[in-house]
């Protein structure tokens, strides 16, 4: 790989560290009784409220409609996600250090696979929370209603408008993957180095013939 491509790959790998600092995803709830709104931030190893009491307020609302409480300690993915991201960082840096284009391609494929599996798992998590309701103890019961928030976008849930979008850490992951793709594409456009045959080499070739 060219020096420029390797620098891009190093930058892409180090950008993953931002996901340990910034939240990956955000879910916002807006309703007339909450003019400032409620928010939930999904981090690499935790789920927190946008404001100090937001997560507890969301859990109290969930109780009214029979949804389970959101307990970060019970979410297994939050325990393994830091190791997955750290592994991606290490693989990317190793590919840049060794400088093999196929390793950079493999890193991109592994990264994309992790992203797809992560989004699918997040959808499943949302589906379970929105459909697995305790209707016997729910105060508000709406037959046939589920409360699954959208994976990406906005959805009306009773009098709440739920919005689910990537947060700063999620965008950092997208930039990281994009930089890796650019590094491979730039390296693929390199022109092969033409070897100039010197006069002495021509003479040696003539002697051999």
Question: What are these regions, as identified by a protein language model?
Answer:
Residues 1-17, 101-112:
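Alpha-helical transmembrane segments and their helix-start/interface "positive-inside/aromatic belt" motifs
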Residues 1-7, 80, 99, 158-168:
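Short, charged/polar micro-motifs that form catalytic or ligand-binding hotspots
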Residues 1-6, 22, 30-36, 185-209:
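Intrinsically disordered terminal tails
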Residues 13-15, 19, 76-96, 108-116, ...:
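Hydrophobic alpha-helical transmembrane segments
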Residues 20-23, 96, 119, 181-187:
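Hydrophobic membrane-targeting alpha-helices
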Residues 21-77, 123-164, 209:
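Long, glycine/tryptophan/cysteine-rich extracytoplasmic
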Residues 84-132, 191-209:
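Hydrophobic alpha-helical transmembrane segments of integral membrane proteins
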Residues 163-190:
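A hydrophobic membrane-anchoring alpha-helix module
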């Amino acid at each position: 790989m060219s020096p420029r491509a390797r620098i891009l790959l190093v930058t892409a790998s180090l950008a993953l560290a931002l996901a340990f600092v910034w939240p990956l995803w955000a879910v916002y709830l807006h309703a007339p009784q909450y003019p400032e709104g409620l928010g939930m931030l999904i981090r690499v190893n935790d789920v927190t409220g946008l404001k100090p009491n937001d997560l507890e307020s969301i859990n109290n609302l969930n109780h009214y409609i029979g949804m389970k409480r959101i307990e970060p300690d019970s979410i297994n993915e939050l325990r393994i996600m830091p190791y997955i991201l750290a592994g991606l960082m290490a693989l990317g840096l190793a590919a840049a250090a060794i400088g093999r284009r196929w390793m950079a391609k493999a890193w991109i494929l592994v990264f994309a696979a992790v992203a797809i599996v992560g989004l699918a798992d997040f959808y499943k998590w949302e589906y379970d929370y929105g459909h697995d309701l305790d209707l016997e103890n729910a105060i508000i019961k709406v037959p046939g209603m589920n409360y699954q928030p959208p994976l990406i976008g906005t959805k009306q849930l009773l009098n709440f408008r739920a919005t689910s979008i990537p947060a700063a850490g999620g965008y950092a992951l997208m930039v990281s993957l994009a930089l890796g793709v650019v590094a491979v594409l730039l390296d693929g456009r390199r022109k092969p180095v033409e070897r100039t045959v010197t006069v002495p080499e021509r003479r040696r070739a003539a002697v051999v013939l």
